[in-house]
UniProtKB/Swiss-Prot annotation:
Record protein name field: Large ribosomal subunit protein uL30
InterPro entries assigned: Ribo_uL30_ferredoxin-like_sf (IPR036919), Ribosomal_uL30_bac-type (IPR005996), Ribosomal_uL30_ferredoxin-like (IPR016082)
The keyword Ribonucleoprotein is annotated on this UniProt entry: yes
Entry GO MF terms: structural constituent of ribosome
Lineage: Bacteria, Pseudomonadati, Thermodesulfobacteriota, Desulfuromonadia, Desulfuromonadales
GN (gene name): rpmD
GO CC terms of this entry: cytosolic large ribosomal subunit
Source superkingdom: Bacteria
GO biological process, alphabetically ordered: translation
A Pfam family matched in the record: Ribosomal_L30
Length: 59
């Protein structure tokens, strides 16, 4: 999967600041343990970095 990243939501966005929930929604992560496959771009990497304590990333 060159150029793609698998991201899984491991911690809930409930009770977090609104900013974090908006970033998660932008990544397509709406439910706990949901996994999405995203293209590997600097913008996506930046969003993942903001919520890195809540997600698990597989290259």
């Amino acid at each position: 999967m060159a150029g793609q990243i698998k991201v899984t939501l491991k911690k809930s966005g409930i009770g977090r600041k609104e900013y974090f929930t908006k970033v998660l929604k932008g990544l397509g992560l709406t439910k706990l343990h949901k996994t999405v496959v995203l293209t590997d771009t600097p913008e996506i990497r930046g969003m993942i970095r903001k919520v890195s304590h809540m997600v698990v990333v597989e290259d």
